[in-house]
Regions:
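C-terminal ends and interior cores of transmembrane alpha-helices
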Residues: 73-91, 311-325
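Juxtamembrane intracellular "pre-TM" segments in multi-pass secondary transporters
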Residues: 201-237, 263
Length: 445
C-alpha cells in the first residue's frame, strides 16, 4: 500500500508541477502579465471555500478517495478547456481565461486536503502512525512535481515536430512547453490519470447516513471550533500571515529569472533560459528536507519548526533579490535550496499539527481549515498585494534575447526592491510568531 500511496502523490503533484512555476510567463506572453497576481490569488480564493466543503463531504457522506477521484476528473476536463482556449487565442482575454482557470482550481485545490485525508485514513486503518509514514509518502509528490517541471522546461512541439532542448540557440527553444499552452495540456492528461488511479484506492469505511446537514455543516463552519484551542488559534492566525509567502515565488520567480535573457551580460546564461529547470531546485530541496520535519518536531518543537520556516522564506526572498545568473548564480541557487525548509517546515508540519488537533469526526475539516487559512485567506490577500508591489517596479515589454531569435515578452524593471520588501515581511512574521506562540505539551505521533 505504501507504493500505491506514493504513486498517488507522484501524480497528484505532477498535475501542478506542469504549470505552476511557469504559468506567469505564459500569462505575460498572452498579454495578461499585469494580472499575474489575480491568477495566483485565485488559488487562495477557491481555498476559502472548497477544501473545507469537500472535507465536510469526506467526513460525512462519501469516501474521501471517491471525492478525490471525482475532483481530479472534473479538473482535468476544465484544464483541457483552458488549453483549447489558450491555444487558439495568442492574446488572452482576462475574463474568459480567468474563469476557466478558476473552474479548474475549484476542483483541483480540494484534492490537496482530500489526498491527505485519504492517506491518513489508510495509514491508520493499517495500524500505522501518520507522523512517521506521511513524510515518506509525501516526498513522492515532490518527485512528481520535479519530473513535470523538467519535462515542460525541455519539451517542445512545433510544426509537427516534438523534441527536447535546453539550448536557447535551438530554433525550437521558444516553443518549449514552459512558454506555451502545452503545459496546460500535459497537466490535463496527468489529471485524468490521477483521477482514474484514485478511484482504485481502497475505501477505508463506507459513508454513514447522517441527519440533515445544517448550513454550518455544509460550509464547514464547525471547523472553526478549533479556534477555541489557544495554541491552534495562534497557529491559524499566523498561517494566514505565512500564506502570504506561499505563492509569491511561484508567480514571479520564473518571469524574474527569464528577464535576465534580455540583459546582454546574462543573455548566454544557461540559467536565464532554463528558469523552470533552475526553479526545480526548490522542489529537489523539498524532497531532501521533507524527512527532516518529523525529527525537527520531536526535537525542537512545533513553535521553532514554524519559526525556522519563516526565516527560510525571508532568506529565499533576500537571495532572489541579490542574485543573478552570472556571478550571483550561487545566491539564486541558495534561494532555491532554502525552499525545502521554508515549505516543508510550514506545510507538512502544519498538516500533521492539524491532524493531531482535530477529533476523529473532523479530520477532513481540520485539513481543509488549514488550507482555507494559508492557501485561502493568506495566499489571496498576499498575492494581490505582492502583485501591486512588483507591478510598481516592473513592467512587461517585447525585448530581443539571443541573436537571431524573435523578441520575447519579458518582465523588465527593478526586481531587487520587491524581493527585499518580501524578505523583510517574512522576517517580521518569524519574530512575531516566536514571541506569540505557546503550546500545550503534545506528543506528535
Amino acid at each position: 500500500m505504501k507504493t500505491r500511496l506514493s504513486i498517488l502523490y507522484f501524480l497528484q503533484f505532477a498535475v501542478w508541477g506542469c504549470y505552476l512555476s511557469c504559468f506567469g510567463q505564459l500569462l505575460g506572453a498572452g498579454g495578461l502579465g499585469a494580472s499575474i497576481q489575480w491568477f495566483y490569488a485565485a488559488v487562495g480564493l477557491v481555498s476559502l471555500f472548497t477544501p473545507a466543503l469537500f472535507g465536510h463531504f469526506a467526513d460525512r457522506f462519501a469516501p474521501s478517495r471517491t471525492l478525490l477521484g471525482a475532483c481530479h476528473l472534473a479538473a482535468c476536463v476544465v484544464m483541457f478547456g483552458a488549453w483549447t482556449y489558450a491555444s487558439s487565442h495568442p492574446q488572452l482575454d482576462f475574463t474568459a481565461f480567468f474563469l476557466l482557470y478558476l473552474g479548474f482550481l475549484a476542483f483541483y485545490m480540494p484534492t490537496m486536503a482530500l489526498s491527505n485525508t485519504t492517506t491518513f485514513a489508510i495509514i491508520r486503518s493499517r495500524g500505522g502512525l501518520p507522523m512517521e509514514q506521511f513524510p515518506k509518502l509525501r516526498i513522492w509528490g515532490t518527485i512528481g512535481f520535479i519530473a513535470a517541471m523538467w519535462f515542460v522546461n525541455s519539451a517542445y512541439y512545433h510544426d509537427g515536430s516534438f523534441g527536447f532542448t535546453l539550448s536557447d540557440s535551438d530554433p525550437a527553444s521558444h516553443f518549449r512547453f514552459q512558454y506555451t499552452p502545452m503545459q496546460l495540456l500535459v497537466s490535463s492528461i496527468l489529471g485524468l490519470l490521477t483521477g482514474l488511479y484514485a478511484l482504485t484506492l481502497p475505501v477505508v469505511k463506507a459513508p454513514e447516513k447522517k441527519p440533515a446537514a445544517s448550513l454550518s455543516d455544509i460550509f464547514g463552519l464547525k471547523a472553526f471550533r478549533l479556534f477555541k484551542i489557544p495554541s491552534v488559534r495562534t497557529f491559524l492566525i499566523f498561517a494566514v500571515l505565512t500564506g502570504v509567502c506561499l505563492q509569491i515565488s511561484n508567480g514571479f520567480a520564473v518571469p524574474y529569472i527569464n528577464h535576465f535573457m534580455a540583459r546582454a551580460e546574462y543573455s548566454s546564461s544557461l540559467a536565464a533560459g532554463n528558469a523552470t529547470l533552475l526553479f526545480s531546485l526548490s522542489q529537489i530541496s523539498e524532497a531532501f528536507c521533507i524527512l527532516l520535519v518529523g525529527v525537527a518536531m520531536k526535537r525542537i518543537g512545533f513553535r521553532w519548526v514554524i519559526t525556522i520556516a519563516l526565516l527560510a522564506w525571508s532568506a529565499r526572498f533576500l537571495c532572489l533579490g541579490l542574485g543573478n545568473p552570472g556571478d550571483g548564480l550561487i545566491l539564486l541557487i541558495i534561494s532555491m535550496l532554502v525552499y525545502g525548509i521554508a515549505f516543508n517546515f510550514f506545510n507538512i508540519a502544519g498538516h500533521i499539527y492539524m491532524e493531531q488537533a482535530s477529533d476523529t469526526s473532523n479530520k477532513g475539516f481540520g485539513q481543509g481549515l488549514l488550507m482555507l487559512m494559508s492557501n485561502g485567506i493568506g495566499a489571496t490577500g498576499g498575492m494581490i498585494i505582492a502583485g501591486s508591489v512588483v507591478n510598481s517596479f516592473c513592467h512587461w515589454e517585447m525585448v530581443p534575447t539571443t541573436p537571431g531569435a524573435a523578441p520575447m515578452r519579458l518582465f523588465m524593471g527593478d526586481w531587487t526592491s520587491p524581493w527585499l520588501i518580501f524578505a523583510a515581511y517574512a522576517l517580521t512574521v518569524a519574530i512575531l510568531f516566536a514571541l506569540c506562540y505557546r503550546a500545550t505539551t503534545r506528543k506528535y505521533n
